[in-house]
């Protein structure tokens, strides 16, 4: 029988990292726990890893504290919004909206969602001096405590606490804010997962260096420049762009080339091709399309070379018949008009003769006016895949119109919202139609809305997880005037409206709750008898404890929790774990549990977790002895955990 109290671990700025070293390189520690550096160097040299003598790092006031924050356990619990989640359109949804501090939410997610997130897109505060970013921290450390836990001297601890408690918008404060969030986010990413971070010039340089430290410089995919505005303000340089920094968990696991099937121009050409092919044939088909192409060519970039059409659609000529880099196949192709062999590519053809004969029979080869032009291969618009350009031209004001469609009653529901088109493009390049897309700075809810749209239009199966702080809307704002008191309320309403426009995909809602197990000694009085009464849980506390435990034990928030009747006692089964939280677990309930293990072929728990505060010591021992000594017919070994 194992006893544990979750979220009670005493962590330091380096304790988790040290534990990883001890687990993977035990030979590098002596019997007293001292690290033997030379042993690790031997392992590295034996693996023929080159040792660099040059290095640099980014340091700031609060870095040790930021690392400590990344390691500390959450100080909250997670609760389900049952009323919302049980609605017909939401009850089977895999999408999640979570209310609360995103650092706390990420900490809760680690056990269940580690290495499961395909893509992260975040739009954190830019720290412009005008966006309202101020670092606030409600953790209550004394200088002495922080000095010990973060491994810093007392003077530095005092200076850190000064800016964390009084509020600051310095570079150091912003880095202290963003570091632990990115650190935990990396743990959630799949090996082939990517993270896209929107930022502007104010923190771009700092963010790049801190990402190098967290994700590894070798896993930097690139930086995108988003040209999203026109700046007519009097200045030396008109600032008309933002940045999107891109990193991956493991670049060796990333596909070598990103291409996207999503293109508005492609869709236009495919539709025009189908329309014209249904109306015209032969020379008239090409003549009509040529006329249309000349009129619209300026709108067709990057497909403004697709000037031909046949019954199969609109196409262009490609020199992909050339063999790249080495000697290819040699044979003659006769020009249909001059009856002479066509000029061959310098290195020959890339296809063998039988493949070329098939392409010729299918009329997929383009000939020039005579034999002096090298043949080309027909490449159809319907097969076009777009590459991700490092420069994105997309008017940021489009987001205002997107929101106006959802909130016609409001002039400006959100400020500085990102456009659906931007996030849609990023997802289409980095993902392949499935996986979890995470946004822990939900804001206007653009990422979640984009996932709804993609799943509806392209029949993809993405799931979003999006997190938003319960932040008040501004006084006299459009949102406040329409009854939305918090950003979360408005984000949730956007997702409700967006879901209705996209096959009612729905979403589930969860929220952080104060940890009711945490007690403050200053609250202890003789009249406050419930201070001692840990066994009395309200229905909300009961459900919150169950939700938090299931997530802590590795179950996704969308995993069903099944009620189990044990002779009138209600237990809960989730992913093979049986939870006993309610009081009054009787001998009859224990007997019913053992009988169910034997007789119910679908009931095969591997662990029993019970709430220690609701089980007297004698009952704990009875349960432990019964499970250890009972030889059930399925030969199941049941682990027993007493949890508080």
From Swiss-Prot:
Its EC number is 2.1.1.72. PROSITE patterns: N6_MTASE. InterPro entries: DNA_methylase_N4/N6 (IPR002941), DNA_methylase_N6_adenine_CS (IPR002052), N4/N6-MTase_EcoPI_Mod-like (IPR002295), SAM-dependent_MTases_sf (IPR029063), T3RM_EcoP15I_C (IPR041405). Transmembrane segments: none annotated. One of its GO terms (molecular function) is N-methyltransferase activity. Gene3D superfamilies: Vaccinia Virus protein VP39 (3.40.50.150). The keyword tRNA-binding does not apply. It catalyses: a 2'-deoxyadenosine in DNA + S-adenosyl-L-methionine = an N(6)-methyl-2'-deoxyadenosine in DNA + S-adenosyl-L-homocysteine + H(+). Keywords: DNA-binding, Methyltransferase, Plasmid, Restriction system, S-adenosyl-L-methionine, Transferase. Residues 123-126 are annotated as: Binding of S-adenosyl methionine. GO terms for biological process: DNA restriction-modification system; methylation. SUPFAM superfamilies: S-adenosyl-L-methionine-dependent methyltransferases. DNA restriction requires both the Res and Mod subunits. This R-M system is also called EcoP15. Forms a homodimer capable of methylating the target sequence in the absence of Res. A heterotetramer with stoichiometry Res(2)Mod(2). A heterotrimer with stoichiometry Res(1)Mod(2). Belongs to the N(4)/N(6)-methyltransferase family. This is Type III restriction-modification enzyme EcoP15I Mod subunit. It comes from Escherichia coli.
């Amino acid at each position: 029988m194992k006893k544990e109290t979750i979220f009670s671990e005493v962590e330091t700025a380096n304790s988790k990292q040290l534990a990883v070293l001890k687990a993977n390189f035990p030979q590098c520690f002596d019997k007293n726990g001292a690290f033997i550096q030379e042993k690790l160097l031997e392992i590295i040299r034996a693996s023929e890893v080159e040792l660099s003598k040059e290095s640099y790092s980014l340091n700031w006031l609060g870095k040790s504290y930021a690392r400590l924050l990344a390691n500390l356990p959450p100080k909250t619990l997670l609760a389900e919004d049952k009323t919302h989640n049980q609605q017909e359109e939401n009850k089977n949804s895999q999408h999640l909206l979570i209310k609360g501090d995103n650092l706390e939410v990420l900490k809760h997610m680690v056990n269940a969602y580690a290495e499961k997130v395909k893509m992260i897109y975040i739009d954190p505060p830019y720290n412009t001096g005008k966006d309202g970013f101020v670092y606030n921290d409600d953790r209550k450390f004394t200088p002495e405590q922080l000095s010990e836990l973060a491994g810093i001297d007392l003077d530095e601890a005092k200076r850190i606490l000064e800016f964390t408690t009084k509020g600051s918008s310095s570079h150091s404060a912003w880095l202290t804010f963003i570091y632990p969030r990115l650190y935990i986010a990396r743990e959630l990413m799949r090996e082939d997962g990517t993270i896209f971070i929107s930022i502007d010039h104010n923190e771009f340089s700092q963010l790049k260096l801190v990402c190098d430290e967290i994700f590894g410089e070798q896993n930097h995919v690139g930086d995108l420049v988003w040209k999203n505005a026109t700046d007519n303000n009097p200045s030396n340089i008109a600032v008309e762009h933002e940045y999107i920094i891109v990193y991956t968990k493991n670049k060796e696991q990333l596909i070598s080339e990103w291409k996207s099937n999503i293109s508005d121009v492609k869709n236009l050409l495919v539709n025009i091709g189908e329309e014209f092919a249904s109306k015209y044939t032969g020379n008239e088909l090409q003549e009509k399309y040529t006329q249309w192409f000349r009129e619209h060519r300026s709108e067709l970039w990057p497909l403004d070379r697709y000037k031909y059409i046949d019954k199969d659609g609109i196409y262009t000529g490609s020199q992909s018949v050339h063999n790249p880099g080495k000697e290819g196949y040699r044979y003659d192709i006769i020009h249909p008009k001059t009856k002479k062999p066509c000029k061959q590519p310098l290195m020959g053809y890339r296809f063998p003769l039988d493949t070329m004969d098939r392409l010729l029979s299918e009329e997929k080869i383009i000939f020039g006016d005579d034999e002096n032009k090298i043949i080309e291969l027909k490449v159809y618009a319907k097969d076009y895949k777009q590459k991700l350009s490092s420069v994105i031209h997309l008017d940021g004001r489009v987001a205002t119109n997107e929101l106006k469609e959802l909130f016609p009653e409001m002039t400006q529901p959100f400020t500085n919202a990102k456009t659906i088109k931007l996030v849609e493009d990023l997802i289409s390049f980095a993902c392949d139609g499935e996986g979890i897309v995470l946004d822990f700075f939900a804001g206007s809810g653009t990422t979640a809305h984009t996932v709804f749209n993609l799943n509806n239009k392209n029949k993809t199966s993405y799931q979003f997880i999006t997190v938003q702080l319960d932040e008040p809307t501004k006084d006299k704002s459009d949102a406040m005037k329409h009854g939305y008191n918090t950003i979360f309320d408005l984000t949730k309403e956007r997702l409700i409206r967006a879901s209705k426009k996209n096959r009612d995909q729905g979403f589930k809602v969860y929220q952080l709750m104060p940890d009711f197990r945490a007690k403050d000694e200053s609250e202890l009085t003789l009249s406050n008898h419930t201070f001692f009464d840990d066994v009395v849980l309200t229905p909300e506390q009961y459900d919150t404890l169950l939700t938090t435990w299931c997530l802590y034990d590795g179950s996704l928030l969308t995993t069903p929790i099944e009620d189990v009747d044990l002779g009138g006692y209600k237990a809960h089964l989730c992913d093979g774990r049986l939870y006993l939280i309610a009081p009054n677990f009787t001998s009859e309930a224990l007997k019913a549990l053992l009988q169910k293990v034997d007789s119910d072929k679908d009931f095969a728990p591997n662990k029993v977790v019970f709430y220690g505060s609701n089980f007297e010591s004698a009952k704990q021992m009875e349960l432990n002895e019964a499970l250890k000594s009972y030889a059930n017919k399925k030969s199941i070994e049941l682990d027993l955990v007493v949890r508080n």
